[in-house]
Amino acid sequence: MSVKTKTITILPGDHVGTEIVNEAIKVLEAIEAATPYQKIHFDFKHHLIGGAAIDATGVPLPDDALESAKNSDAVLLGAVGGPKWGTGALRPEQGLLKIRKELNLYANIRPCNFASDSLLELSPLRPEVVKGTNLIIVRELVGGIYFGDREEQEESADKQTAWDTEKYTVDEVTRITRMAAFMALQHTPPLPIWSLDKANVLASSRLWRRTVDKVISEEFPTLSVQHQLIDSAAMILIQNPTKLNGIIITSNMFGDIISDEASVIPGSLGLLPSASLASLPDTNTAFGLYEPCHGSAPDLPANKVNPIATILSAASMLRLSLDCVKEAEALEEAVKQVLDKGIRTADLRGTSSTTEVGDAIVEAVTKILKEKA
């Protein structure tokens, strides 16, 4: 059996980014050594992004990092940002926005579920309210107001005006709808689709709604889609989150907000992975960028950050970009086993360190894979 090499660009970023990415690499190396399903080698290419890149090169995304990403099978990112770099002309977050745009990462996939039912008690909502929550937010990532025209005008100190433009095309909405439909069809029976917009006041949302309806009815007639105003959906997500189980599709800004709201339901940002894709993962080889939902946590002491979100992001990378579906399933099972054993960082009311959690997951996934041999 020939060895299959997969190239992964590693962008640790700032603060805890290095720690969490190191744990994910450790787990991936264990999978490489133990998997009985195929001979595989992960070739890691390390580069800078964010504040670390600004300090070293003067820009938040150096050309060599972008070029490496373009020539890789996937990108694994830690986290960017921190108070050191403030909100000036050069900001760490600009590196993330640029790489999304340059790599055409148009779809952000964020699940909201419980990696283990033993975590239900950690949710800020009552366990009986959140039990069974299982939704996937598909956010359009390279269009809308974040990439529209904008301007700040100052005629005088007392007279200032600023505006941002929300703009969507039929093509942009069509491709994100197809992504949501593909995700829905990966389940038996297919998952329902919820489309969130503000069609009662925004022209862009009315185009969004019309396009979603057209794509689903013409291309995916077996799927169901329901429309919900974003403000109403935000309330439902807290009152009765399981009502929104399935696939949620929404625009860039609305997706940014609703996915952050959803991320607190499981009790910790340290649990939730994120994938940003440039194409449908219909052959499990879509190019993607994978990162945790949380930020760089500059105030957190060393070896205290929860690495699970990044490790689960690596599991998503295995499944969607690296054609290692069985390895991804083994890794997700390993995470569940470790959580059920109570090996947890402080954000999950545990006492384990970052490296201890990573080591436990390495041990668990190695055992699972060797049992399959």
UniProtKB/Swiss-Prot annotation:
GO terms for biological process: L-leucine biosynthetic process. Substrate binds at R100, R110, R139, D231. Mg(2+) binds at D231, D256, D260. Its EC number is 1.1.1.85. GO terms for cellular component: cytosol. SMART domains: Iso_dh. It holds the Pfam family Iso_dh. Its cofactor is Mg(2+); Mn(2+). NAD(+) binds at residues 82-93, 295-306. The keyword Cytoplasm applies. It is found in: Cytoplasm. InterPro entries: IsoCit/isopropylmalate_DH_CS, IsoPropMal-DH-like_dom, Isopropylmalate_DH. Keywords: Amino-acid biosynthesis, Branched-chain amino acid biosynthesis, Cytoplasm, Leucine biosynthesis, Magnesium, Manganese, Metal-binding, NAD, Oxidoreductase. Homodimer. Catalyzes the oxidation of 3-carboxy-2-hydroxy-4-methylpentanoate (3-isopropylmalate) to 3-carboxy-4-methyl-2-oxopentanoate. The product decarboxylates to 4-methyl-2 oxopentanoate. This is 3-isopropylmalate dehydrogenase.
